[in-house]
Swiss-Prot record:
The lineage of its organism: Bacteria, Pseudomonadati, Pseudomonadota, Betaproteobacteria, Burkholderiales. It comes from the Bacteria. It comes from Burkholderia vietnamiensis (strain G4 / LMG 22486) (Burkholderia cepacia (strain R1808)). It catalyses: N-succinyl-(2S,6S)-2,6-diaminopimelate + H2O = (2S,6S)-2,6-diaminopimelate + succinate. This is Succinyl-diaminopimelate desuccinylase. Binds 2 Zn(2+) or Co(2+) ions per subunit.
């Protein structure tokens, strides 16, 4: 069994359902400390975070490449639906099964073993290697990577490159990597009316009727045209509630929840202003609460993307597509202190599902790609 596969199975065997790390980071810390990494545990409200760094011969003048990821996994769902227990690694049909196999314990193991092989081959490497690991990525993500980034920023620590081990690939290892992500902003809208008997509408004010024209306009609005890297911004309703359940009562208020997925072509302030303008134009009496869970980030083509594309092609023969599709990730936090952030990991077809798995043929090539990037950028 390869070193990467053995470590992957060791991590999968830890039932680290978010935010419980289940000592996964302790396993990683022991391996990193043996390589000469300075390891720091940063705990926050039940969340375990790890910051580990190994400087090269250039000290702080050398380029720093960070590997970022998460030890937490999503809940298993009904155990009886799993073919084999989710926290007992199992091999079937050329695949490794277990919760976290794809998202993202194989990436974590590949980070570690790639670093071990790199340091053994390049003991006098010039640049620095770092690890930023959290147990709060699959949950609220309020005490994980964002807290470590805030701490590093306060210390004046800047990263040059960061690879986030998210499962970005589609059919083959390396066919898709993420060089950016859209931002996410949600709104909770309450439109006020006047409750009354449905037979006497002149004595009431129906908030559903009042909201409907504004809702139609919001749904039809083109928020931007996107750009070279991002599709156009989208606005979608996630929840709409009104009424008491009775058939003869006009409701007193209508509640709407919606979400923007927005690109670098729009700003938080600009989108908020346009929503308020539409609501105000329709004369609504309303309250609107905003929450921004992530800003968009983008890494244009450069040293990191070139190194990663070259490493993937050399290892797998696959031509890589740079993409910004999908949901948010911790890359949105890291981008605050790192100009080049790219996500790359195994295929994502089984993530968060029953019988999550990774094809065994991808395990060592994933490690090799990470090692090749280290060799290109910080040797």
């Amino acid at each position: 069994m390869s070193a990467t596969l053995a470590l992957t199975e060791q991590l999968i065997a830890r039932a680290s359902v978010t935010p419980d790390d289940q000592h996964c980071q302790q396993i990683m810390t022991e391996r990193l400390a043996a390589l000469g990494f300075e390891c720091e545990t940063i705990a926050s409200h039940g969340v375990t975070n790890l910051w580990a760094v190994k400087r090269g011969t250039a000290g702080r003048d050398g380029k720093l490449l960070a590997f970022a990821g998460h030890t937490d996994v999503v809940p298993t769902g009904p155990l009886e639906q799993w073919t084999s227990p989710p926290f007992i690694p199992a091999h079937r049909d050329g695949k490794l099964y277990g919760r976290g196999a794809a998202d993202m314990k194989t990436s974590l193991a590949a980070f570690i073993v790639a670093s071990e092989e790199f340091v053994a081959a390049h003991p006098d490497h010039r640049g620095a290697i770092a690890f930023l690991i959290t147990s709060d990525e699959e949950g609220p993500a309020t005490d994980g990577t964002v807290k470590v980034v805030e701490l590093l920023d306060a210390r004046g620590e800047q990263l040059d490159y960061c690879i986030v081990g998210e499962p970005t690939s589609s059919a083959e290892l390396g066919d898709v990597v993420k060089n950016g992500r859209r931002g996410s902003m949600s709104g909770e809208l309450i439109v006020k009316g006047v409750q009354g008997h449905i037979a006497y509408p002149h004595l009431a004010k129906n908030p559903i009727h009042l909201l409907a024209p504004a809702l139609a306009e919001l749904a039809a609005e083109q928020w931007d045209a996107g750009n070279e890297y991002f599709p156009p911004t989208t606005w979608q309703v996630s929840n709409l509630r009104a009424g008491t359940g009775a058939t003869n009562v006009i409701p007193g208020h209508a509640d709407l929840m919606f979400n923007f997925r927005f690109s670098t072509a729009s700003t938080v302030e600009g989108l908020q202003a346009r929503v308020h303008a539409i609501l105000d134009k329709h004369g609504l009496d309303y309250t609107l609460k905003w929450s921004v869970s992530g800003l968009p980030f983008l890494t244009p083509r450069g040293e990191l993307s070139n190194a990663l594309e070259h490493a993937i092609r050399a290892e797998t023969g696959v031509t890589t597509e740079l993409s910004t599709t999908g949901g948010t990730s911790d890359g949105r936090f890291i981008a605050r202190i790192c100009p080049q952030v790219i996500e790359f990991g195994p295929p994502n077809g089984s993530i968060h599902k029953i019988d999550e798995h990774i094809e065994l043929r991808f395990v060592d090539p994933l490690k090799n790609v990470y090692r090749r990037v280290l060799e290109q950028l910080i040797a």
